[in-house]
Amino acid sequence: MDITLTIFAQALAFAGLIWIVATKIWPPLLQAIEERQQKIAEGLAAADRSQKDLAQAQEKVNEALKDARTKANEIIDQAHARANQIIEAAKLEAIAEANRQKDLAQTEIDASATRAREELRKQVSVLAVSGAEKLLKREIDANAHKALLDELAAEI
């Protein structure tokens, strides 16, 4: 065999190999590579969307926490205000009850004082009548009168 014929046969075989590879092997290989690239691109896009969704969810969570803290502070403030109102109402009620008890005690004291005065008037009137009887029974004497009046004053 001649070298030219050998080179020509090899060139023909190589061209046949290239044609087989280009028509039968290369298109499915390119299709597989493109599908893989598309899947990778979709995965990257999904990862980007997931990161954006995560960031949005984190913002929503932070906003919800902020709202919850605000509402909790409002509830705490309302509770403090209500507690202060209850305390103030209890103070006013206690003051009113103390004043009522004081008024009752004062009324009782006044009644006792009135009864004591009446009792003293009765006793004074009895003593005055008794003293007048003694004065009238004795003889009229300035020293005796003075002694009786001193005795009455001591009894009163």
From Swiss-Prot:
A GO molecular function assigned to this protein is: proton-transporting ATPase activity, rotational mechanism
Cross-referenced CDD domains, in alphabetical order? ATP-synt_Fo_b (cd06503)
Membrane-crossing segments per the record: 3-23
CC per GO annotation: plasma membrane; proton-transporting ATP synthase complex
One Pfam family of this protein, by short name?
ATP-synt_B
Instruction: Write the record's keywords in alphabetical order, separated by commas.
Output: ATP synthesis, Cell inner membrane, Cell membrane, CF(0), Hydrogen ion transport, Ion transport, Membrane, Transmembrane, Transmembrane helix, Transport
Superkingdom of the source species? Bacteria
Under the heading InterPro entries, the entry gives: ATP_synth_B-like_membr_sf, ATP_synth_b/b'su_bac/chlpt, ATP_synth_F0_bsu_bac, ATP_synthase_B_chain
Mostly located where? membrane
Function, as annotated: F(1)F(0) ATP synthase produces ATP from ADP in the presence of a proton or sodium gradient. F-type ATPases consist of two structural domains, F(1) containing the extramembraneous catalytic core and F(0) containing the membrane proton channel, linked together by a central stalk and a peripheral stalk. During catalysis, ATP synthesis in the catalytic domain of F(1) is coupled via a rotary mechanism of the central stalk subunits to proton translocation.
Subunit composition? F-type ATPases have 2 components, F(1) - the catalytic core - and F(0) - the membrane proton channel. F(1) has five subunits: alpha(3), beta(3), gamma(1), delta(1), epsilon(1). F(0) has three main subunits: a(1), b(2) and c(10-14). The alpha and beta chains form an alternating ring which encloses part of the gamma chain. F(1) is attached to F(0) by a central stalk formed by the gamma and epsilon chains, while a peripheral stalk is formed by the delta and b chains.
The entry sums up its family as follows: Belongs to the ATPase B chain family.
| Name this polypeptide is given | ATP synthase subunit b
Q: List the source organism.
A: Xanthomonas euvesicatoria pv. vesicatoria (strain 85-10) (Xanthomonas campestris pv. vesicatoria)
